[in-house]
């Protein structure tokens, strides 16, 4: 069951708090643009999953009311809210191929791929579309 069953559906750019401030049950980490050109506020949700395969990490993130971060969003988290992250490697939402997926090490911010069957950590993010 999601921790925040009523997340914000949209948010205006003018109403965004400072990076690192509370927003929608988490911490505002910055802005991103999805592949469909939707601009979104990124919220790092509280807590973290550990000892999770990639598939289990995706399920865990959904249970938190969010999703695993994409590779660009993981880089955004590292750049803007590193102090709120556990060091070590964390799954991203992106597959490399059928057997491998990408992860981000929040100690250095670098990204590599690893077998999806390996157990790692995870963070969950929520992306809130921006309105004018």
Map each language-model feature to its residues:
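Extracellular adhesion/carbohydrate-recognition regions
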Residues: 1-66, 115-116, 121-125
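C-terminal, surface-exposed recognition/capping segments
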Residues: 71-132
